[in-house]
């Protein structure tokens, strides 16, 4: 997904990929995607390297990031997407190998600073290793910021109805740490834990301790939804809330936070470029201080 997104940007060039898969299989996985469709471009393998749209991409299969010699291909930023090197100490091996910056594509396992577009990018101070948090946090944080900035959040609960992930089982199987997580993904709605709501408190300190949440894993291949239920400090009608979110989506958060009043369903957001889209028709208000936002 990172690779496909980068192909649409003129200011990003992929120069190297490190994976334990061989280059032929990597080319196959890039060409064909059951969820996002076929790759719109040319993909071939030559002398162990990927050639994508005529551009050569170095392919390596190193287990230790320190051996990657990123400086040989002029790497500026490494997207650390293995899910393994999620601390400053382990991710710093990429810096040792010659990279200038490292972005962890999930939450870190230590105090590596976390940045979410639309929430706290203005706090970035040049750190060489950062976390981009989770997909759920990227969905929740921009909306939570708009609501808190305009109306104040006293407290809130979040539920994410989350699409199936690769760690789940196709049929029931052993899962010693998470018994429910071991049940068949295509057969069940599976309650699960998530740290996404609490992580919002790291990127928006003013909300620290005010939000928590949980997840339901559901049998859909892509697109998840966040249900945010909050108590407001400043009373507001649902129409006022919609207006505030729409203004942000068309203003300072354009391209990050979207807004729709259409009768949409999850597949309508397959390939959506905004990290969060407010579904104006799906939310409800019990009163002017207690609302559910989707």
Swiss-Prot record:
Pathway(s) where this gene product acts:
Carbohydrate degradation; glycolysis; pyruvate from D-glyceraldehyde 3-phosphate: step 1/5
Q: Where in the cell is it found?
A: Cytoplasm
Protein residues bound to NAD(+): 19, 63, 105
Gene3D superfamilies, per the entry: Dihydrodipicolinate Reductase, domain 2 (3.30.360.10), NAD(P)-binding Rossmann-like Domain (3.40.50.720)
Q: Which NCBIfam families match?
A: GAPDH-I, PRK15425.1
Q: Which UniProt keywords apply?
A: Cytoplasm, Glycolysis, NAD, Nucleotide-binding, Oxidoreductase
* Cellular component aspect of the GO annotation: cytoplasm
Q: Which GO terms describe its biological process?
A: glucose metabolic process; glycolytic process
Q: Which InterPro entries match?
A: GlycerAld/Erythrose_P_DH, GlycerAld_3-P_DH_AS, GlycerAld_3-P_DH_cat, GlycerAld_3-P_DH_NAD(P)-bd, Glyceraldehyde-3-P_DH_1, NAD(P)-bd_dom_sf
Please describe what this protein does: Catalyzes the oxidative phosphorylation of glyceraldehyde 3-phosphate (G3P) to 1,3-bisphosphoglycerate (BPG) using the cofactor NAD. The first reaction step involves the formation of a hemiacetal intermediate between G3P and a cysteine residue, and this hemiacetal intermediate is then oxidized to a thioester, with concomitant reduction of NAD to NADH. The reduced NADH is then exchanged with the second NAD, and the thioester is attacked by a nucleophilic inorganic phosphate to produce BPG.
Binding-site positions, D-glyceraldehyde 3-phosphate: 134-136, 165, 194-195, 217
What sort of enzyme, by top EC class, is this?
oxidoreductase
Q: What is this protein called?
A: Glyceraldehyde-3-phosphate dehydrogenase
Q: Which residues form a coiled coil?
A: none
- In the Enzyme Commission scheme, what number(s) does this protein have? 1.2.1.12
Q: Which domain of life is it from?
A: Bacteria
Q: How does it assemble?
A: Homotetramer.
What would be an example GO MF term here?
A: glyceraldehyde-3-phosphate dehydrogenase (NAD+) (phosphorylating) activity
This enzyme catalyses:
D-glyceraldehyde 3-phosphate + phosphate + NAD(+) = (2R)-3-phospho-glyceroyl phosphate + NADH + H(+)
**Principal localization?**
cytoplasm
Q: Which organism is it from?
A: Escherichia fergusonii
């Amino acid at each position: 997904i990172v690779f496909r997104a980068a192909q649409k940007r003129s200011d990003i060039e992929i120069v190297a990929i490190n994976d334990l898969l061989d280059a032929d299989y990597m080319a196959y996985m890039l060409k064909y995607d059951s969820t996002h469709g076929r790759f719109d471009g040319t993909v071939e393998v030559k002398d162990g390297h990927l050639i994508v749209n005529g551009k050569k991409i170095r392919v390596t299969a190193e287990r230790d990031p320190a051996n990657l010699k990123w400086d040989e291909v002029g790497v500026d930023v490494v997207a650390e997407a293995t899910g393994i090197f999620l601390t400053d100490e382990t991710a710093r091996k990429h810096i040792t190998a010659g990279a200038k910056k490292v972005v962890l594509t999930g939450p870190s396992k230590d105090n590596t600073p976390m940045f979410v577009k639309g929430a706290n990018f203005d706090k970035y101070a040049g750190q060489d290793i950062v976390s981009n948090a989770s997909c759920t946090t990227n969905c929740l944080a921009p909306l939570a910021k708009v609501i808190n900035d305009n109306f104040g959040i006293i407290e809130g609960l979040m539920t994410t109805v989350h699409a199936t992930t690769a760690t789940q089982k196709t049929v029931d199987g052993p899962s010693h740490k998470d018994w429910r997580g071991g049940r068949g993904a295509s057969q069940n709605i599976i309650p699960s834990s998530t740290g996404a709501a609490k992580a919002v408190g790291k990127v928006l300190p003013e909300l620290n301790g005010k939000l928590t949440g949980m997840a339901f894993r559901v049998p859909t291949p892509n697109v998840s939804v966040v249900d945010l239920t909050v108590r407001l400090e400043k009373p507001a009608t649902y129409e006022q809330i919609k207006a505030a979110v729409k203004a942000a989506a068309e203003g300072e958060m354009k391209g990050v936070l979207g807004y729709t009043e259409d009768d949409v369903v999850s597949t309508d957001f397959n390939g959506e470029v905004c990290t969060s889209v407010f579904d104006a028709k799906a939310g409800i208000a019990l009163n002017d201080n207690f609302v559910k936002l989707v």
